[in-house]
């Protein structure tokens, strides 16, 4: 099944799996999703992910979710820029999530990265979603 917004699909799968306290969740594989998951892993919001190849030739990403004292590490995950309403921010206007306790994930000319990495690299871009 094709989705029109793969980032929203990924966010929804993670949110739903954490509400049910699932240890893992899978999603169709793509480079963009893998890059987003790499940012979430480096920031400590997920344990990890692995690419799984099926005999039919399609790949899936198996995401290992992270919990602390039985509660999901991700308290809120919210889509900001959508296909119908793109949200861009310059390096000066990058949003701070909960006074710096959360992160914004951006798509920049230098790749997908967290907001603090974008500030360090002095680049702006499309604000994909926020995590707290």
Curated annotation (Swiss-Prot):
Role played: One of the primary rRNA binding proteins, it binds directly to 16S rRNA central domain where it helps coordinate assembly of the platform of the 30S subunit.
Organism for this UniProt entry: Nitrobacter winogradskyi (strain ATCC 25391 / DSM 10237 / CIP 104748 / NCIMB 11846 / Nb-255)
Gene Ontology biological process terms from the UniProt entry: translation
Keyword tags: Ribonucleoprotein, Ribosomal protein, RNA-binding, rRNA-binding
Entry keyword Protein transport: no
GO function term, MF aspect, one: structural constituent of ribosome
Name the record gives this protein: Small ribosomal subunit protein uS8
Subunit structure: Part of the 30S ribosomal subunit. Contacts proteins S5 and S12.
Top-level taxonomy: Bacteria, Pseudomonadati, Pseudomonadota, Alphaproteobacteria, Hyphomicrobiales
Superkingdom of the source species: Bacteria
Family stated for the protein in its record: Belongs to the universal ribosomal protein uS8 family.
Annotated Gene Ontology cellular component terms: ribonucleoprotein complex; ribosome
InterPro entries: Ribosomal_uS8, Ribosomal_uS8_CS, Ribosomal_uS8_sf
